[in-house]
Each structure stands twice: as C-alpha cells, then as structure tokens.
C-alpha cells in the first residue's frame, strides 16, 4: 500500500488515517533540482522545487497539499500535468482561524473525505480517527529551538548532532499540535466542524492573518537559544526573524538554505561556531557564589555578533563587529571584546 505524503501542519492526517491511509511527511531535501527545473520557473522557491523533485523522481504516488502560498498552488498545477500521481489533492483553507473560516474548512474536509474514500475504497472509521490524535511532548529543561521555515530532515539531524543542548524542531509543519474532538459529537458533520476548528486553532504559521499565537514557540523558560531557518526566495519567515532579533534575549543564529543538500557543509560551519558559544565560561571557584556565563556567537558574511549571558539569562555584554577576511578570526576578536566589556576572561 502506498503511503500518502503531506507537507503542511494543516493537513488532516487523522482524517486520512481514518480512511485507511498511512501518512508520511515529505521532508527530504534533494541533492539538486535537475528534474524540477525542467517543468518549473527558475524563480520558484526551493521548497516548491523540492516537492516537484521528490514527485518527479518517482518515489511518491499519493500527495495531499494545502494552499499555503502561491508556490504550492503553482506546484499543484505543475503536478496535475506532469506528476503522474495516483492521488493528488489540494485543500483550500482560508487565512483566519474562526468564523467563516471554520465553516469553509469543514466543507473542505468533507470533500476530501469523499474523494479519498472513493480512491481508497474505504469508509470513515470513527474509532481509528479518534485514536490517531497524539498528545505533544515538548522538551523540558534547557534546550535550543529551531524556528522558521522547514529545514528538512537531514539538516535538522545535523543541527541536533552539532548543538550541545537538546534541540527541538518547531519549524513549519513540525510544530503541529491538533487537539482531539469531543468523542460525543453526534454525527460526521459535527465531528468535522470540531476537527476544522482544532486544525485552524493550532499555533499559527506565518501565512495566517493573526500570528500572535506564535509567541508560544519562544516564550519558554527553558529556551537557551534559537536557530532560525529561512528558505531562499521565501519572504514569509524573514519578517518574524527581524522581530525576534530585536526581542529575544537568548543567542540567535539565522540559517538560510535553498532547499537542497548542497549548502549543508557551509551551514555546518556556522552551526559549529554557534555551538562553541554555548561552552560554559567558568568564573573563579569561590564556593556557592560561583557563577557561570554563556557566550553566543553568530558569524555572518558581513558582521559577527557576540552576546554574553549570565546563568539567569541577563545580558552582560553584546558586541557587533565586521567579520573581516576570516570567520574564525572575526569570531575570536568579537568574543575578546565582549569578554572585556563584561569584565570576564575565558579562564
């Protein structure tokens, strides 16, 4: 049996499961876009191209999309003509979380259930639907969170391996959290209305009109640092990064990829520099009053940022210097100046 691939947190995976489907997140970054470039405009963003590349490579037979943005709508149109899929469907969801948006989403869910059930030759299994909801298990204690646009399984795995603290993937589809409807709902129509409300009531993605709920992703007492990922030519998440750069008191690293695996070694270097900033700076051992410090380093192509925090997450010093000819040398100079400003040393 072929799995049904999906890309978006608003995909009703529990409904598809209740109709006999096996849902798999399409989250792999290709090596290149040699196939997608043959059928898509060169300016299509890397995420859209990665979807096309995966389908055209022949490993996907069933795909459910959500109209997240113009790129996904374009990808859907291209796949209708060139994808040769057994099942291709796109949900049309509005950008609000209540009112008419819930009614519209309910209609979309009912239409999808009819189309998918006809394709599979199955009927809705209420018990399987309710059993498909899984409670979220967020990290507790000090941790680093990856925010922004999806970064792909390979890049996230590398991020986990390089960073010194437990790392949580809260990008895009990976912060999905859908509450289970009331099992006492009398009929399928009422159940789908509750389900639509739960889907739209998740922590919003950047396509939604009201994005204030996204603060839950970083207003966390255990948050020790943030890696913020964006995709080249995608504007949605750049605005949030600009806001967080001003608001966050924890170390922040921005990464940008093009949707392929080709830039991963360059990103590895930046992640390694960021990880070094979490090495605990030991103060002289004076007994119970001894205090630890943390330094975060973000070495970019033009500037290098260093921030030093105490164990209570208070900023002790912050320095921004031109990176210069060598990233490692620029990071060392910036760290030395930040330590001097904080009255500390690396010993």
Regions found by a protein language model. Give the residues of each.
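Short glycine-rich, Thr/Ser-proximal phosphate-binding strand/loop in the N-terminal lobe
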Residues: 297-337
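A broad structural signal for short, well-ordered beta-strand segments within beta-sheet-rich domains
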Residues: 167, 315, 346-347
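Short, intrinsically disordered/low-complexity patches at protein termini
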Residues: 277-278, 329, 339-342
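Phosphate/pyrophosphate-binding loops at sites that engage ATP/ADP/AMP, CoA/4′-phosphopantetheine
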Residues: 335-347
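An N-terminal assembly and electron-transfer interface module characteristic of large anaerobic redox
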Residues: 1-294, 312, 324
């Amino acid at each position: 049996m072929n799995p049904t691939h999906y890309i978006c947190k608003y995909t009703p995976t529990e409904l598809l499961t209740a109709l006999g489907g096996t849902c798999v997140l399409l989250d792999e970054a290709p090596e290149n876009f040699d196939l997608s470039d043959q059928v898509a405009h060169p300016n299509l963003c890397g995420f859209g191209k990665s979807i096309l590349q995966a389908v055209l490579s022949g490993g996907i037979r069933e795909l459910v999309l959500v109209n997240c943005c113009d790129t996904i709508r374009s990808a859907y149109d291209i796949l209708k003509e060139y994808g040769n899929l057994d099942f291709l469907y796109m949900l049309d969801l509005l950008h609000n979380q209540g009112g008419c948006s819930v009614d519209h989403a309910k209609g979309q869910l009912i239409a999808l259930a009819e189309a998918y059930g006809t394709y599979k030759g199955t009927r809705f299994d209420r018990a399987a639907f309710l059993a498909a909801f899984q409670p979220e298990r967020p990290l507790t204690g000090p941790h680093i969170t990856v925010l922004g646009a999806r970064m792909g399984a390979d890049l996230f795995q590398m991020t986990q391996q390089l960073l010194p603290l437990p790392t949580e993937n809260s990008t895009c589809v990976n912060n999905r959290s859908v509450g289970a409807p009331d099992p006492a709902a009398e009929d399928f129509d009422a159940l789908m209305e509750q389900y639509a409300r739960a889907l739209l009531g998740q922590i919003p993605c950047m396509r939604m009109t009201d994005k204030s709920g996204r603060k839950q992703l970083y207003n966390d007492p255990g948050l020790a640092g943030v890696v913020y990922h964006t995709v080249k030519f995608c504007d949605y998440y750049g605005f949030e990064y600009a806001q967080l750069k001003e608001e966050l008191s924890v170390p922040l690293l921005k990464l940008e990829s093009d949707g392929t695996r080709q830039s991963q070694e360059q990103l590895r270097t930046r992640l390694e520099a960021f990880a070094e900033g979490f090495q605990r700076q030991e103060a002289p051992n004076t007994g119970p009053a001894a205090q630890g410090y943390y330094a975060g380093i973000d070495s970019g192509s033009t500037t290098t940022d260093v921030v030093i925090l105490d164990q209570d997450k208070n900023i002790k010093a912050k320095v921004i210097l031109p990176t210069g000819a060598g990233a490692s040398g620029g990071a060392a100079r910036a760290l030395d100046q930040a330590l001097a400003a904080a009255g500390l040393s690396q010993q």
